[in-house]
């Protein structure tokens, strides 16, 4: 989810972020403390617009499948007694679980917009308790929610937690509940008024003894896959290639950790069969590794270099770039470097088909070729983000206890499973190796515009600098122009 309440982009000067390096520990145990469950692709309308958000009986690894439909990742959980089913958007870029209530004006409208994600009714639960009325979260695009913090029973991945705190959106403009699993310091009640934090889901699992460390791994799988997986307290070596390499999370200039941000030290494009990479010149950039963002957002100047390398056409009205849908078959890869580990992203993961509009029409270029969204957008003045278009190509371990993220190339559609428990302490196994001399400071994004990038506005003539047959500009954008892209410039703030 783009941004949160620490609001990196409000600094008047470019701050430096720094950290000390510690190590992720992974322990092989006969009975690992890991909770795992699937995350799923869940069908929603206008998924890119929603960038607002954007089982283990005898073990302690908590596993959950992830739904993955139209670029949003969800998990299934229940709240209350008797259980009420919720599908919540998994978000490493925020920290609260919040859900809609059916009685809100938004959810009770004739279109029933909240039916897919589910709603929570406190009056129907015998274990509900009110905490306070202080829940208040909003996004720059105007969407958000206000309501109550409450406690109730939660059941996720077969694990039940009593008196678990979450929020109810009595007033909401989003149909989707969010399961934020970032730092407790990023919770809305902390960032809004400086209130004491509470144990969100990863911390509550540690507190209850279900996992040993406030850490989890994320495997989104490829764009066409219906499911991925999240493991709280563990990793699955069957889901990645090679070894995990560990880089530090960057802290703010105040010295605290509020978001899962690392130093992106290089971006390039792999063009040759020899594996050589043409790197775009850039200083290290602070980027959030954010599963709640469908697209990825790079500094304007860097995004411009990427666009020029793939002949993308930028539509400033929507803050989106377009490419021919046939580019999904291009064999080039964008390569993202983090001091040492790299994520190589194929074009088939970056080219997003919007599908037809309500009238069955599809976006096309003037030459008749079908137009698709390119999965990289300019960050403007907001913090840069690597969202699902990049994270699908990586296996990631978020270690909130040690303020680290471990990275390895993913194994798409792997059916192999070898679960290891994440323990406590330092340097316990070779599966996660600290990167020597990792970059520990980086610049926050600055808005510079997109110099040298071909632009196109729906309905305009092709740019005169290119022949009409070369100009790759969409004739129209499927309803996006009217609503904008909610993910652009998003951040949390108190209403």
UniProtKB/Swiss-Prot annotation:
UniProt keyword terms in alphabetical order: Aspartyl protease, Cell membrane, Glycoprotein, GPI-anchor, Hydrolase, Lipoprotein, Membrane, Protease, Signal, Virulence, Zymogen
Propeptide: 468-495
Annotated compartments: Cell membrane
Annotated lipid attachment (GPI-anchor amidated alanine): 467
GO CC annotation: plasma membrane; side of membrane
Signal peptide: 1-19
Peptidase A1 domain sequence ranges: 73-408
EC number(s) reported in the record: 3.4.23.-
The UniProt record lists the keyword Cell membrane: yes
Family: Belongs to the peptidase A1 family.
Name of the molecule in the record: Probable aspartic-type endopeptidase OPSB
